């Protein structure tokens, strides 16, 4: 698929469209995702086997002392199939950019945003799905969505001061009682069948996550009111927003966009790497994903959009709502000179404006152009990058996804900032579980890198320099 995409770009728009359509219909003969995977996996296994036989000893990169002390930043050490993050272009899902996904992925009737089901199909197969395939996936998830009674009881008895992410992680861990993989492994299943059970568990978990997340929301913020029943005629996002208690069509559209663009961001981020690592021990998808959610709950990973909103609210308190560019510029400089950062700006990998920010900005320009908070975000977009460039410290002065998402959620009435990371988690399931299926299909082994002590590292460096 990546080769088709690259070739399409080289051949120009007209031929590109033909190639994309060819790729789209290459897997259009079936609406059963598992059947399509069963056809794709042996071919990919053979391709990688040949590649490793020919190039297994090829050196990919060098590791420096700074990389080891610096969070392994920039170290090439993982194979992650579903997405790749380009510093200049942003995320590509199986070779497709966000604008391409917005254009090509199927949409709900009367909707304009891509359906997350379509993105999951793309992440798993490498192909843009048909509307029929996406409809099959929506119905399949609806069919698998019911929660076991012990998980419902557990959620209903959590104290209201327990953080929503702690509740999500605990509930997903408890869903491990339903794991097909864990039961089959205990009975001695063949390694060649691992992916099939991981697929079943992943499909079940993705189907159940909106129910878990909605129950958490209702218990914490809506006095424990019921989430209602899943409607098999609605898509995954629409059922989710219904269960949350939101009926605004635009909010459902925003949710479709949000769940699509937050789904995957290559394999080195904390949640994706955690899922990959825990899964490599043959922990089932429930345990692997729960571990990923504990990583996402960390303030350096999943809480950034909350920090942006807190900063924006504080900014408005201090300088007022109708602030001039000059006053705003002074406020930003005061923030930087006090040793703080401007939340929502910069990224560990990206060196341009995050395309996830851009598509949210376009949504806001279309649906809420006069919202005061959006106007402030748009004003910051004009000013902050220039200030950061003047300061000269930031490698990337441009806004990331977190600079915008919270403002959109607030506009539609979801003001409970502690809950935002749960939405992020529901979305991230699409990416990390698609990869988990492929990790078992390709037989990736237990992850076990070599560690060194500072003393050992110093001796090693001395031996090299001597």
From Swiss-Prot:
Phylogenetic lineage: Eukaryota, Metazoa, Chordata, Craniata, Vertebrata
Modified residues (N6-succinyllysine): 57, 76, 103, 193, 321, 327, 375, 393, 450, 459
Transit peptide interval: 1-27
Sequence motif: SIFI-degron, positions: 2-21
PANTHER family: CITRATE SYNTHASE (PTHR11739), CITRATE SYNTHASE, MITOCHONDRIAL (PTHR11739:SF8)
Effect of residue 393 to R: Does not inhibit methylation
InterPro entries, per database record: Citrate_synth-like_lrg_a-sub, Citrate_synth-like_sm_a-sub, Citrate_synthase, Citrate_synthase_AS, Citrate_synthase_euk, Citrate_synthase_sf
Catalytic reactions on record: oxaloacetate + acetyl-CoA + H2O = citrate + CoA + H(+)
Gene: CS
Protein's name according to its UniProt entry: Citrate synthase, mitochondrial
Classification via Gene3D superfamilies: Citrate Synthase, domain 1, Cytochrome P450-Terp, domain 2
Annotated binding of oxaloacetate, by residue: 356, 428, 448
EC number: 2.3.3.1
Protein's organism: Homo sapiens
GO cellular component labels: extracellular exosome; mitochondrial matrix; mitochondrion; nucleus
């Amino acid at each position: 698929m990546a080769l088709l995409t690259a070739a399409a770009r080289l051949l120009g728009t007209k031929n590109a469209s033909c190639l994309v359509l060819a790729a789209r219909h290459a897997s259009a003969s079936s609406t059963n995702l598992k059947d399509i995977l069963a056809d794709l996996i042996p071919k990919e296994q053979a391709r990688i086997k040949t590649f490793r036989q020919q190039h297994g000893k090829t050196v990919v990169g060098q590791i420096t002392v700074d990389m080891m002390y610096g969070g392994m930043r920039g170290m090439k050490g993982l194979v992650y199939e579903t997405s790749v993050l380009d510093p200049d272009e942003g995320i590509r899902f199986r070779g497709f950019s966000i604008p391409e996904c917005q254009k090509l992925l199927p949409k709900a009737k009367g909707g304009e945003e891509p359906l997350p089901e379509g993105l999951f199909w793309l992440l798993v197969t490498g192909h843009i799905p048909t509307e029929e395939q996406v409809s099959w996936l929506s119905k399949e998830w609806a069919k698998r969505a019911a929660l076991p009674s012990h998980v419902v009881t557990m959620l209903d008895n959590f104290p209201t001061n327990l953080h929503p992410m702690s509740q999500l992680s605990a509930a997903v861990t408890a869903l491990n009682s339903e794991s097909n993989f864990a039961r089959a492994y205990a009975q001695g299943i063949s390694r060649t069948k691992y992916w099939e059970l991981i697929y079943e568990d992943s499909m079940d978990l993705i189907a159940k996550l909106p129910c878990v997340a909605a129950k958490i929301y209702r218990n914490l913020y809506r006095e424990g009111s019921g989430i209602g029943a899943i409607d098999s005629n609605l898509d995954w996002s629409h059922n989710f927003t219904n269960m949350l208690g939101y009926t605004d069509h635009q909010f459902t559209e925003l949710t479709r966009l949000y769940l699509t663009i937050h789904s995957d961001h290559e394999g080195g981020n904390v949640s994706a790497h955690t899922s990959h690592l825990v899964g490599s021990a043959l922990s089932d998808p429930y345990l692997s994903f729960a571990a990923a959610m504990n990583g996402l709950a960390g303030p350096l990973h999943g809480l950034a959009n909350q920090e942006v909103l807190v900063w924006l609210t504080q900014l408005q308190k201090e300088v007022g709502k109708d602030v001039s560019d000059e006053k705003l510029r002074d406020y930003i400089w005061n923030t930087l000179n006090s040793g703080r950062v401007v939340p929502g700006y910069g990224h560990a990998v990206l060196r341009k404006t995050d395309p996830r920010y851009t598509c949210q900005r376009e949504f806001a320009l279309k649906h809420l152009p006069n919202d005061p908070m959006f106007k402030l975000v748009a004003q910051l977009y004009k000013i902050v990058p220039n200030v950061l460039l003047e300061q000269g410290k930031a490698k990337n002065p441009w806004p990331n996804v977190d600079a915008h998402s919270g403002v959109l959620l607030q506009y539609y009435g979801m003001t409970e900032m502690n809950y935002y990371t749960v939405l992020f988690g529901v979305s991230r399931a699409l990416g990390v579980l698609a990869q988990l299926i492929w990790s078992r299909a390709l037989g990736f082994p237990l992850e076990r890198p070599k560690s060194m002590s500072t003393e050992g590292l110093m001796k090693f460096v001395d031996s090299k320099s001597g």
